[in-house]
UniProtKB/Swiss-Prot annotation:
Cysteine disulfide links: none
InterPro entries linked: Met_Sox_Rdtase_MsrB, Met_Sox_Rdtase_MsrB_dom, Mss4-like_sf
Signal peptide from the UniProt entry: 1-32
Reactions that this protein is recorded to catalyse: L-methionyl-[protein] + [thioredoxin]-disulfide + H2O = L-methionyl-(R)-S-oxide-[protein] + [thioredoxin]-dithiol; [thioredoxin]-disulfide + L-methionine + H2O = L-methionine (R)-S-oxide + [thioredoxin]-dithiol
Enzyme class: oxidoreductase
Effect of mutating residue 160 to F: 7000-fold reduction in activity
TM stretches of this protein: none
Subunit structure, as described in the record: Monomer.
Name of the protein: Methionine-R-sulfoxide reductase B3
EC annotation from Swiss-Prot or TrEMBL: 1.8.4.12, 1.8.4.14
């Protein structure tokens, strides 16, 4: 009987890890919500229209899953009361009361206005596992969510300023238009 040949243990472990990561990436492309494939979104805009309406940075972040530079976004240090919305379709996402300074360099929130407004997708880019957040109405990339936020949720929605628009609260303390989706005619091109 000849001796059984096996791979050296470090190589065997490395191959097993690679196989697990590939399987996780393949299976992890599943998401909660239904709007990662732009064809299934409730609100759809042509790429031509989005390039006209959005700044180059807004387009890069929301349509190409880009990330703006840390500490340079319009809303990083923003403290006014109001509602933060998706810059692409106007869906209300976050209240200013849930915004906090995480020190990360991006606007951070510990809760969303409506849990159905955001889609969560596993993201295995850059050799790590994160959870991407996208607008569930139009599929715009917003940022990522982490489990290191403050109470009561323990969540940190780390969101690119370029993915947001802001509606200030009026004198009665409520934000204008906090419940609707902006039409393309209503959405102004925001300059960052």
């Amino acid at each position: 009987m000849s001796p059984r040949r096996t791979l050296p243990r470090p190589l065997s472990l490395c191959l097993s890890l690679c196989l697990c990561l590939c399987l996780a990436a393949a299976l992890g492309s599943a998401q909660s919500g239904s709007c990662r494939d732009k064809k299934n979104c409730k609100v759809v805009f042509s790429q031509q229209e989005l390039r006209k309406r959005l700044t180059p940075l807004q387009y890069h972040v929301t349509q190409e899953k880009g990330t703006e530079s840390a500490f340079e976004g319009e809303y990083t240090h923003h403290k006014d009361p109001g509602i933060y919305k998706c810059v692409v379709c106007g869906t209300p996402l976050f209240k200013s009361e849930t915004k906090f300074d995480s020190g990360s360099g991006w606007p951070s929130f510990h809760d969303v206005i409506n849990s159905e407004a955001i889609t969560f997708t596993d993201d295995f880019s850059y050799g790590m596992h994160r959870v991407e957040t996208s607008c569930s109405q139009c599929g715009a990339h917003l940022g990522h969510i982490f489990d290191d936020g403050p109470r009561p949720t323990g969540k940190r929605y780390c969101i690119n300023s370029a993915a947001l628009s802001f509606t200030p609260a009026d004198s009665s303390g409520t934000a204008e238009g906090g419940s609707g989706v902006a039409s393309p005619a209503q959405a102004d091109k925001a300059e960052l």
